[in-house]
Every structure is written in C-alpha cells, then in structure tokens.
C-alpha cells in the first residue's frame, strides 16, 4: 500500500502546485491566454498531411519552457499521458488511407501513417502548450484570465469549483489510505469487495466535506461568483507588442514559405 500512498501524495502535491503557478509568466495572464489560444488555433488548422509545417510549431513549447522556469523534457514527459487516448483515435488511419505519401529508400509510407503522426504531434503540442500556461499562471490565474477576456462568470466559477473539489477528493483519499495503513493493512492488496467499500466511503466523505465547505462559503457571503477571479493585471504595452509579435511568428509557421524540417509534407 506504500506505493498507492506515494501516488496519491504526488497527485495531491501536483494539484496544489497548480493553484498559483510559478509566477514567471513573461506577460500578463490575459495576453498569455490569448497567445495560447492563437497558437492552438493556427497549429490545429494545419492540414493533416502537412506534417513538416506542423513540426515548426514545436518551437513554441521548446522556447517557452525555460522562459516560465520549466524544463522542456519534464513537460514533454508529462504530455505523454495522453498518448494512449490519441493512439486509440488515430490507429485506424493507416488501414483506411493507403495512398502513398512518400518513400524513404525502398520503404513506402502511406498517407494514413502521415495523418496518424500528425494527430500524435497535434495532441502532444496542445497538451504541452496548456501545461506551460497553467504552470506559469496557475489555475486560479487561468480562470481569472478567462474571466477578463469575456468568458461568462458561471463557467469560470465552475472550473474553479471543480479544481477545488478535486483537491478535496484527493485529500480524503489520502486520509483513508493512511487510516488503512495504521490498522495493519500495509502492503496488502484490497479485494474487489473492499475496493467497492473504499470507493463508496470515499464518495460519502467527499460529499459530506463538500457540503461543509459550501456552508462555510455561504456564511462568508458567497453569491455564486468569486470576486478574486475578476481581479488581474492591467493590460500594458508590453502585452500588446508581445501578442502581435508572437502572432506574426505563428502566422509565419502556418502560411509562410518555411523550409521543411524533413523531406516530406
């Protein structure tokens, strides 16, 4: 059971670290959020067969990672968590798209494999961009930035609530795991029936604690919105210049006459 505790503790620590972020965002939160949205929009609009052009967009997370105080290798490893889902989505492309895309010596690469790789690259780059955004401004900053660019308060409040209650769920899970270890179950696997009891008790404990938190919020004047999400940095000239410059670079990646990184696409 020691291994399970370690996983829960690591997940809880990572989730709590997401609240405020590193605080090393090079520009204001709304501007960085818009930059990320522009990046995702232009990157995802690249044709599936244009894999060489798509690879140029990998420069953004590689350059952005050290700017916000992160190591790109760590961000890349974290983004690999989506690979099983992406592979499940695109693995059948080579079976349906059998047209020849290019040849490497005597090896023929079909169009299906190119589009499959394109799906993988898009997913990894999208997750890496979002990870860098959250790591730099934090989840609270992200919700505040969404609020400032016009996203309805109801949605930003719901996002913040989901994040808060995820920490509640993990904290209750950690407490139950420690209580089980204290009663002599260290290192022993749980049976299926015990897992059912564990999940049921975890649900009941989480709901009960959530109700206590909600009553405490109401006692402090909560009216459905979080005032802290409406606050944020003042937009300045640096944000405007950076947004325009980075957008031009992304537009160059998308439509410019760039040389191919590889001999295909």
Residues of each region from the PLM?
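Transmembrane alpha-helix interface motif
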Residues: 1-68, 171-265
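Membrane-helix interfacial "entry" motifs
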Residues: 25-28, 70-74, 103, 107-111, ...
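Membrane-helix interface segments
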Residues: 50, 71-72, 152-155
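Interfacial helix-loop-helix linkers and transmembrane-helix boundary segments
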Residues: 53, 71-79
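Generic hydrophobic, aliphatic-rich segments that mediate packing or membrane embedding
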Residues: 58-59, 71, 87, 129
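Juxtamembrane/interface alpha-helical elements of multi-pass membrane proteins
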Residues: 76-183
């Amino acid at each position: 059971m020691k291994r399970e505790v370690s996983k829960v503790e690591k997940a809880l620590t990572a989730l709590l670290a997401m609240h405020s972020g590193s605080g090393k965002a090079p520009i204001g939160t709304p501007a960085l959020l818009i930059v990320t949205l522009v990046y995702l929009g232009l990157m995802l609009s690249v044709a599936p067969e244009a894999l060489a052009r798509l690879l140029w967009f990998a420069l953004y997370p590689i350059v952005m990672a050290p700017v916000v105080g992160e190591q790109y290798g760590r961000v890349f490893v974290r983004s690999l968590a989506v690979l099983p889902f992406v592979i499940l989505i695109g693995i059948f492309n080579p079976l349906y798209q059998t047209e020849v895309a290019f040849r490497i010596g005597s090896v023929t690469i079909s169009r299906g494999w190119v589009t499959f790789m394109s799906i993988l690259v898009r997913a990894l780059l999208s997750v890496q961009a979002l990870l860098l955004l959250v790591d730099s401004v934090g989840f609270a900053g992200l919700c505040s930035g969404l609020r400032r660019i016009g996203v309805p308060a109801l949605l930003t409040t719901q996002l913040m609530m989901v994040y808060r209650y995820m920490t509640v769920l993990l904290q209750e899970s950690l407490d139950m795991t420690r209580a089980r270890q204290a009663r002599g179950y260290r290192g022993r696997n749980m049976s299926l029936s015990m897992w059912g009891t564990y999940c049921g008790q975890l649900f009941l404990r989480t709901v009960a604690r959530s109700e206590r938190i909600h009553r405490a919020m109401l006692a402090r004047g909560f009216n459905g919105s979080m005032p802290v999400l409406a606050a944020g940095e003042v937009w300045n000239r640096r944000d405007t210049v950076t947004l325009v410059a980075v957008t031009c670079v992304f537009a160059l990646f998308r439509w410019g006459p760039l040389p191919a990184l590889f001999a295909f696409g």
